[in-house]
Amino acid sequence: MALIIQKFGGTSVANIDRIKKIVPIIKTEIAKNNQVIVVVSAMAGVTNQLVTLCNELSSLNNISQFAEYDVALSSGEIVTASLLALALQEEDIKARSFLAWQLPMLTDNNHSKALVESITTDLLEKYLQLNTIPIIAGFQGINKSNRLTTLGRGGSDTTAALIAAAMKADRCDIYTDVEGIFTADPRIIPNAKKIKEIDFLEMLELASSGAQVLHPRAGELVMRYKIDMRVLSTFSPDTEGTLITSKDKNMENGIINSITSNKNLLKISVKSMSLSFLQVANMITQNNNHIEFMQEIKNNEEYSFITNLTDKNNLQALLTNLKDDKQIQYFTFDTEIATISLIGYGIKNDCKLLETILSKLTNDNINVHMIQLSEVKITLFINDQDTEKTIFNLYNLFKIS
């Protein structure tokens, strides 16, 4: 008997008909004599609607307001969890919904971007022994003040990975609207190939570079705890997806296996005569704002940072306060930036590879602002209007398959 965590994303639970179609997928695992725990997202579009409603009512500029914001946003997953439990019960399958405070899933106090500190699994273990399927509302936690928190965008992926780790699950299955992970975005490269099996580290680099099938925090967790994960389509449940697992790789190979892009970025330029580069960086990373790249520009007074576009409102308030206090002279935002990332083991050590890439992009009149290297990834910072062209040209140049 294996323990399987199944996570269903927003498009998988977008309406009642789709929720009903999840039931046979869960029953398939039960028929294999496996135990199942389900994690659900809000119905597609619901979280965005709740965000809009909150923004119409509040400026969201203090902790009390963000606490209420989290209560509102967490309601989407609560509705889905209860509806799926009802759908299973209608098929004579014992199931019940669980909310974060009932477990509990304890987090820190960073509302809208909370980090999970601990999960109590006693209730989950109890109901599994009673042959009852726990349906967990993803994306949410509870802090030590008994206030609901949310885990940020992609939080249901994170919930699923955390539950898999806490329960020592045999596998975590992520059900979405695509049939796995592809060598490139099929909307840009129609002949992109599905990857049958991918290493943890490659998947983490893909997720952190803009691939939409898995949130980077979930990728970090499955790699840390070595949890096998599958990415599957809710709409083609019998189709083989992509297995994320530990694989032996030749670190000297220098082969590009996939390419991805990210337009959800914000470039921040700051000038400060009183704050150091590291002081500004430390302020930006408060409240779990994530810096993708940072650079001193000149004279130890001008700094450049690239962060997630979703952090723009938080950072606008922070930097405006610093400017009002005369700790910085000015700041600017640039949203017309994107990254292209090429993923594959050994590529950092292949000098000719980078030379080939830059030569191709120069010939194509594509301006590369910055380059970032890791053992398995080359990331190019370009103008966002060149994204599709760059992906198409590099994909064909290296014949990625």
From Swiss-Prot:
| Species per Swiss-Prot/TrEMBL record | Rickettsia conorii (strain ATCC VR-613 / Malish 7)
Please list the GO terms describing molecular function.
aspartate kinase activity; ATP binding
Query: Which GO BP terms apply?
Result: diaminopimelate biosynthetic process; homoserine biosynthetic process; lysine biosynthetic process via diaminopimelate; threonine biosynthetic process
Which reactions appear under catalytic activity for this entry?
L-aspartate + ATP = 4-phospho-L-aspartate + ADP
Q: Which gene encodes it?
A: lysC
Show the CDD domains listed in the entry.
AAK_AKii-LysC-BS (cd04261)
Under the heading PANTHER family, the entry gives:
ASPARTATE KINASE (PTHR21499), ASPARTOKINASE (PTHR21499:SF3)
Assigned protein family: Belongs to the aspartokinase family.
- Its recorded name reads Aspartokinase
Q: In which pathway does it act?
A: Amino-acid biosynthesis; L-lysine biosynthesis via DAP pathway; (S)-tetrahydrodipicolinate from L-aspartate: step 1/4; Amino-acid biosynthesis; L-methionine biosynthesis via de novo pathway; L-homoserine from L-aspartate: step 1/3; Amino-acid biosynthesis; L-threonine biosynthesis; L-threonine from L-aspartate: step 1/5
Q: Which UniProt keywords apply?
A: Amino-acid biosynthesis, ATP-binding, Diaminopimelate biosynthesis, Kinase, Lysine biosynthesis, Nucleotide-binding, Transferase
As recorded in UniProt, its EC number(s) are 2.7.2.4
